Amino acid sequence: MVSGGGSKTSGGEAASSGHRRSRHTSAAEQAQSSANKALRSQNQQPQNHGGGTESTNKAIQQYTVDARLHAVFEQSGESGKSFDYSQSLKTAPYDSSVPEQQITAYLSRIQRGGYTQPFGCLIAVEESTFTIIGYSENAREMLGLMSQSVPSIEDKSEVLTIGTDLRSLFKSSSYLLLERAFVAREITLLNPIWIHSNNTGKPFYAILHRVDVGILIDLEPARTEDPALSIAGAVQSQKLAVRAISHLQSLPSGDIKLLCDTVVESVRDLTGYDRVMVYKFHEDEHGEVVAESKRNDLEPYIGLHYPATDIPQASRFLFKQNRVRMIVDCYASPVRVVQDDRLTQFICLVGSTLRAPHGCHAQYMTNMGSIASLAMAVIINGNEEDGNGVNTGGRNSMRLWGLVVCHHTSARCIPFPLRYACEFLMQAFGLQLNMELQLALQVSEKRVLRMQTLLCDMLLRDSPAGIVTQRPSIMDLVKCNGAAFLYQGKYYPLGVTPTDSQINDIVEWLVANHSDSTGLSTDSLGDAGYPRAAALGDAVCGMAVACITKRDFLFWFRSHTEKEIKWGGAKHHPEDKDDGQRMNPRSSFQTFLEVVKSRCQPWETAEMDAIHSLQLILRDSFKESEAMDSKAAAAGAVQPHGDDMVQQGMQEIGAVAREMVRLIETATVPIFAVDIDGCINGWNAKIAELTGLSVEDAMGKSLVRELIYKEYKETVDRLLSCALKGDEGKNVEVKLKTFGSELQGKAMFVVVNACSSKDYLNNIVGVCFVGQDVTGHKIVMDKFINIQGDYKAIIHSPNPLIPPIFAADENTCCLEWNTAMEKLTGWPRSEVIGKLLVREVFGSYCRLKGPDALTKFMIVLHNAIGGQDTDKFPFPFFDRKGEFIQALLTLNKRVSIDGKIIGAFCFLQIPSPELQQALEVQRRQESEYFSRRKELAYIFQVIKNPLSGLRFTNSLLEDMDLNEDQKQLLETSVSCEKQISKIVGDMDVKSIDDGSFLLERTEFFIGNVTNAVVSQVMLVVRERNLQLIRNIPTEVKSMAVYGDQIRLQQVLAEFLLSIVRYAPMEGSVELHLCPTLNQMADGFSAVRLEFRMACAGEGVPPEKVQDMFHSSRWTSPEGLGLSVCRKILKLMNGGVQYIREFERSYFLIVIELPVPLMMMMPSS
């Protein structure tokens, strides 16, 4: 189905053994080493049912199947029998072992086949001596080295042979280019090199790459003899690719199908192939055509699925090494590679475009009517983990998501520049696809989290069986055909599930064979070893199970895959018989359906994570249920532990915040901040120095109206508006006014990052701007862009105000490289002028961080040449010494006198170390903040279970025969339990600030409130050996009022606890309550309650009191608690003061509450 030079059974290389000692590790060695190590350890590792290990195990199993099929194909060729692909695949067991020698030989045949395609020729060279050690047999003819007439006696011996110096075959200008390429660190970045044959002058694209024995050179005939035209053609191909990339980037997000449909249309427009498809690899390694663009008369393949063996693992590995694979003519006879007898094995052709397809694949292409093909790898971030769960990163973390495959019904050859442009397009497609997959994953995770929350709420409200018997249910957690819950011996099935007897049999099998596992997932119960899988039929093929306790299990079931497969093209008529011995798309499709007949869709890693999370939640819930009494007794200890964690977290965040403030105040970069009204509330010393406006004078001024130039007001307004909504802008240029006699009338330019300032409730309360002074840079750049004469004196000036500048012509060749660029990169101007900026200058000389960075740079450079400027583009690279440089790149079009665009100017801006340090501190602070928020969310979640235990225990006590004292203690316990529930439910406390905080209005007795408040401080009172003096009139305790009892007791308890904490040891604390009855205007009565909480000495520290009255800043958890309680009290029409008198201090709390009509109040 897919052309990769190795699809179906192999990639087509002949085998040999042994290695010559070399300086480079070949891709063949990497593949053989990794496969052999994996196969040796396969039987030593326990089965894993999710994540990267399972995917690796499947790939390892696939290697063995591929090798076995390859052996069958080879044997059929030797015996003269036809190769029945479908039958061979059906009879190839996945679990049988293959000798390691057979795997090694198979991989060697794939990668070291010894044959090339005839559309070009190949030469292998020893790197240090330029001595030829191998060449394809058609090289002499292509280079014009074979005599066209009868040779005479004077004829010299053949020029091209083993041991010939490569430089003698090409013109002097060509071999100079080759010599320079041979010493390059990244030789592939210089491809293609334009060279000419010494004999005929015929031009070639030389495509170089290193292998274990030297350097391999693919020579492809070029279509023009003018190298300038070749460069222009390459640039034109890149422009077409950039146009296609821009189209991809303009698509709406959230639609992967639209992205795939668009890329096949773009590739078909770019290359002209008859059919272009996107071929996706699923987690179980099988493939599917998910998008297609074709000629109208061709049969559609969209919707077809294919077995994993259609594209062997070895071929997939090759696609990660050489991302573009072209087959020009499957009918063409392959050309043998002649090589030095001293080489102990065939030359590795992994990186060669000329590598010949294996006979099996050529046969497959012939059967499907495809003569030529082009296959391009789609690579995304794989986030692969090692056995310890650690992300390995690097190149190995890139995953082959699929292929973009082109087919043509006649021979077709795409020149290297166009293939390279297609590779750029694939890199951009991979980046865009990766973002879409991440977005889809986030949406899925949010849905799962929302579902888990609903299921957890069910667990708290009802019995555990509610997650099956109610909606939503566990079936809504992951995609499945049925689900079940085996709880305390009772079976709760949903959808398509086994019967009671069958589920009991499955449980017995699990206990007997997987007793040491907490769960199991499989796409085939039969393959997993369940002996009675056949009795379940096609309805139940796959299963995921989570073990909650030894007798309680959660199950999810899926039916066989064939039910999920839909044919997306023309219907296959029943009378059209497929020939199983002829390999073609339909027979592959039927073979796939046979292979997956007893399999379900594989369980994805995200689905298993969701199941595992629910398993952990249920386990905790069941443990709480089994030990309810002990948990209830220990419940009082949960909240203090939570407070300790919160306090520790708050102290750490406070320390980071103080460090951040210190850095801001002493930073050598301009930093300023505004509140939600746009008025200055932060102004560091550097911005004061640059603007001439002191900190005192700046405070309170409007940023937009008083400090910004008129032409920038709209930009700053938009930046502020977005930042106050949480959308933080970056690298925005702002023009500030200056003050003072020395700076009067001068403008200051600063490039800022806008950071939303948030309070402890995560509410946005302002915006902080971290800037970089670019006044000198801006002035020089403006002059430089507008100048119309000799500008060299400006850009090559050693003045430090001159930024690093380089320029490109319309073919992306380096036209300018100023002194600042020489100093920054270490590369002199003479070495880069005339070189291609993409791949040569930035790529080979100044290395970028991977191919994705190169793709992005190519896009913005071509955009600038096309008239679209780019401002402050992140552009990190490595200088000549290998040191990493972080820079921002601004690109502007170059315009001739007559207004024609003739290239691009590029300006680099290097952020100062102070700015980078400030941003790093900000990132650490945000990371710490979100980490603590997660911990708090976890505490709030897990505390609900012991609260349920408390509520249950209290409800049991209420039904008992209690005396009056016991009833009062029970009422106090219930009030405290309700208070905790209220606090735990206050995750969205921003409503306290905006006034939308909901207060209840119920009738309650004041005595119940004071009893609950006092009970919450008694432990601290005893610890500090204090005496608590209560002066509360007896008649007030029995007084009934209207209001929010729980919130009132929360507020009073917080204030009283603060007094108790800071009262002198062995001293006393006083609690006075003085009521006053008032007649309201509407005829109703209200009581004014005045609480006085006092102790000797200073009492609560001044900083805690300041925290209480500050709306957004606090230094401790206690200050935060006091501030929140003050706000709640204010919403209840109350108020608080902290008063210090001679030798005593106290809180004075006043609140007025309505009194029921029938309540009489004695005069105070």
Swiss-Prot record:
* Matching PROSITE patterns: HIS_KIN, PAS, PHYTOCHROME_1, PHYTOCHROME_2
Organism annotation: Arabidopsis thaliana
- For the GAF domain, which residue ranges apply? 255-437
NCBIfam families in alphabetical order: sensory_box (TIGR00229)
SMART domains listed in its UniProt record: GAF, HATPase_c, HisKA, PAS
Question: What protein is this chain from?
Answer: Phytochrome D
Q: Which residues form the PAS domain?
A: 656-727, 790-861
Q: Entry's Pfam families? A: GAF (PF01590), HATPase_c (PF02518), HisKA (PF00512), PAS (PF00989), PAS_2 (PF08446), PHY (PF00360)
Query: Residues in domain Histidine kinase?
Result: 938-1157
Sequence segments annotated as region (Disordered): 1-55
Q: How does it assemble?
A: Homodimer.
Q: Which lineage?
A: Eukaryota, Viridiplantae, Streptophyta, Embryophyta, Tracheophyta
Q: Which post-translational modifications are recorded for this protein?
A: Contains one covalently linked phytochromobilin chromophore.
Extract one GO BP annotation from the record.
red, far-red light phototransduction
Q: Name one GO molecular function term.
A: protein homodimerization activity
The reply on keyword Transcription is yes
Coiled-coil features, chain-numbered ranges = none
The biased composition feature labelled Polar residues covers 25-55
Q: Which family does this protein fall into?
A: Belongs to the phytochrome family.
General function of this protein: Regulatory photoreceptor which exists in two forms that are reversibly interconvertible by light: the Pr form that absorbs maximally in the red region of the spectrum and the Pfr form that absorbs maximally in the far-red region. Photoconversion of Pr to Pfr induces an array of morphogenic responses, whereas reconversion of Pfr to Pr cancels the induction of those responses. Pfr controls the expression of a number of nuclear genes including those encoding the small subunit of ribulose-bisphosphate carboxylase, chlorophyll A/B binding protein, protochlorophyllide reductase, rRNA, etc.
Q: Which UniProt keywords apply?
A: Chromophore, Photoreceptor protein, Receptor, Repeat, Sensory transduction, Transcription, Transcription regulation
> Which of this chain's residues are annotated to bind phytochromobilin?
360
One GO CC term, this protein: nucleus
